[in-house]
Each structure stands twice: as structure tokens, then as C-alpha cells.
């Protein structure tokens, strides 16, 4: 089983699909990585040689932010917005939608379960 960026890749999947199990690598990034390392995208993960795995690992470590580093960068970006006090930061602080969606109705994913208000009837 190949272990790249702290993730055990699934054995019986094509390597182009298996790489997408790493947080921060999608289909297009996986294809670019395989092209840069000259690994066939149709190769199964369990058929990779140690050299292929080390080339993939080096390419990912050198050029792409993945897993913990990426999560940390995203959370730091959100924290920076909140510290600035800009509109987007305030929306993050209040737990409301950030990108202009309506909140009179809907927005339940961000706001959480509905809290009923006493005496509110039509």
C-alpha cells in the first residue's frame, strides 16, 4: 500500500483516482502530477514501483500544499478576515453565509437547526 502525504492510498484503484483521496488534490491536479512524474494514470496503486511512489511523493512535497498545511492556511485566511473586521470576517464570526446568499429563509447549513421563536405566528 502506497503512503503519500500521510495518507494510505487505496490498493485496487487507478493511481489518478487514488491521488484524489489526498486533501488538496483533485482530478486535474492528479493528472498534472502524473504527467510531471511520467507515471501512467491507468496504473493500479498496488502495481506502482517504489521509484514511482518516491517520485510522486517528491513532486507532491515540492509543488503542492496538501493535508495539514492546506487546512492550516485556509483557517489562517479565515482568521485574518475575522481579525480585520471586514464584512466577510463579520459574517464568518456570526456564522452566517459569507457570499451574499439570502438569510430570511434558508441558510440552515450555516445557521444550524431552526430555533423557534415564542409568539411568532402569522
Swiss-Prot record:
Region (Disordered) location: 97-122
Top-level taxon in the UniProt lineage: Bacteria
A Gene Ontology molecular function term of the record: tRNA binding
PROSITE patterns linked: RIBOSOMAL_S13_1 (PS00646), RIBOSOMAL_S13_2 (PS50159)
Gene Ontology terms describing biological process: translation
Cross-referenced Gene3D superfamilies: 1.10.8.50, 30s ribosomal protein s13, domain 2 (4.10.910.10)
Described function: Located at the top of the head of the 30S subunit, it contacts several helices of the 16S rRNA. In the 70S ribosome it contacts the 23S rRNA (bridge B1a) and protein L5 of the 50S subunit (bridge B1b), connecting the 2 subunits; these bridges are implicated in subunit movement. Contacts the tRNAs in the A and P-sites.
Assembly, per entry: Part of the 30S ribosomal subunit. Forms a loose heterodimer with protein S19. Forms two bridges to the 50S subunit in the 70S ribosome.
This protein's name: Small ribosomal subunit protein uS13
Species of provenance: Pelobacter propionicus (strain DSM 2379 / NBRC 103807 / OttBd1)
Chain's gene name: rpsM
